[in-house]
Amino acid sequence: IENPQDKVAVVIVNDPGLGSDNTDYFNGDIMTYYGRWMYKFEEGARQGLKGVLIIHEDRGAGYPWSVVRASAQSKMDVDSDSDAYHCPLNGWIQFNAAKQLLADNGYDIDQLIEQSKSPDFKPISLKSTVTVSMRNTFDRQQSPNVIGYIPGSGNTDESVIYLGHWDHLGYGAPINGDSIINGATDNAVAIAWMLEMARCLNALKEKPRRNIVFLSPTCE
């Protein structure tokens, strides 16, 4: 990409192999890390882009636009890598909006998506420009990771690790006075499962040969 510092890339979600049975091309219909939104933002920063906009499509993303909209209200980063691989602008664009954007520049979105599946595909430049103005607030917080440990009875050079994050989205807009986002089908289920595994394994008369580690990080 020429002059990437002046460009905002518009990219498709998922891998080029989406919908394919050919597991030799990426991993076929199974998403690889290269199809994830985080990788696309990271790669955009590595290329020196001004920004990256991912075209949302339900099947490719695995969730509807409402999930993107809800998760865009806040973002958490670890201090040690908060400045790594971030473009000044990272975001998503609705499929129909991207379709109109490309049409305004003389391109058909479906044709371009099909062409992009070829290893020989090269990015195209659009005449459109984008102006963005936003205001952010930053807050630094500390949140502990939790770890539990059952010593092994035999081969203590090896460990089995059970992992589940105990928090996910933290706090949000109060619902009936409760602002905690409990995540009952996400982190709460994993923690309940992990605690029960710890209780059962610790109650065994004959302890497992390997060390058992229960790790619960603060974020997903």
What are these regions (language model features)?
Residues R59-A98:
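Short acidic, glycine/proline-enriched helix-loop-strand junctions
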Residues I1-A70, D157:
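A conserved hydrophobic secondary-structure block that centers on an alpha-helix together
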Residues N14-P16, E57-D58, G152-S153, H165-D167, ...:
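Solvent-exposed coil/turn segments that connect beta secondary-structure elements
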Residues P4, G44, Q94, Y162, ...:
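Terminal peptide-recognition signature
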Residues D29, Y33-Y39, E43, G60, ...:
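Acidic/histidine-rich catalytic neighborhood of metal-dependent amide-processing enzymes
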Residues V8-I12, K50-I55, N90-I93, V146-I147, ...:
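Structural recognition of the beta-strand scaffold that forms the well-ordered cores
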Residues L49, T129, R209-N211:
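A generic structural signal for alpha->beta connector loops
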Residues I1, S82-G183, R199-E206:
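Soluble metallo-hydrolase cores and metallopeptidase-like ectodomains found primarily
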